[in-house]
Amino acid sequence: MTKADIIESVYEKVGFSKKEAAEIVEMVFDTIKETLERGEKIKISGFGNFIVRDKKSRVGRNPQTGEEIEISARRVLTFRPSQVLKNALNGGVSDETEGADDDDDDEEGEGDE
């Protein structure tokens, strides 16, 4: 699905003009982008969490030459889906505890691969 598809869906479902639907979708994406640029977490109930993480610089290895190289510090974006979304993707079936907290703040291990 593309941004144009999302705009079309908003247009069809809400009844705004295509121009209004496009402006609303653009505003939502701009707000999300600006929030993430500030390093803030975005929590969307029933959907998931977007989290910006700072990764430290580290020494890596060139797989072709074996030479050690420095990998610079950077920010990475991770997404953690809510239990509601996970259940929806699995047809309402979950292998995790039913009724798990949707706003789980235990973020250990996310984006650290």
Swiss-Prot record:
The keyword Transcription is annotated on this UniProt entry: yes
Keyword Membrane attributed: no
UniProt-recorded Gene Ontology molecular function terms: DNA binding; structural constituent of chromatin
Annotated region (Disordered), positions in chain: 88-113
Complex formation: Heterodimer of an alpha and a beta chain.
Role description: This protein is one of the two subunits of integration host factor, a specific DNA-binding protein that functions in genetic recombination as well as in transcriptional and translational control.
Protein's recorded name: Integration host factor subunit alpha
The species this protein was found in: Anaeromyxobacter dehalogenans (strain 2CP-C)
Lineage: Bacteria, Pseudomonadati, Myxococcota, Myxococcia, Myxococcales
Gene (name only): ihfA
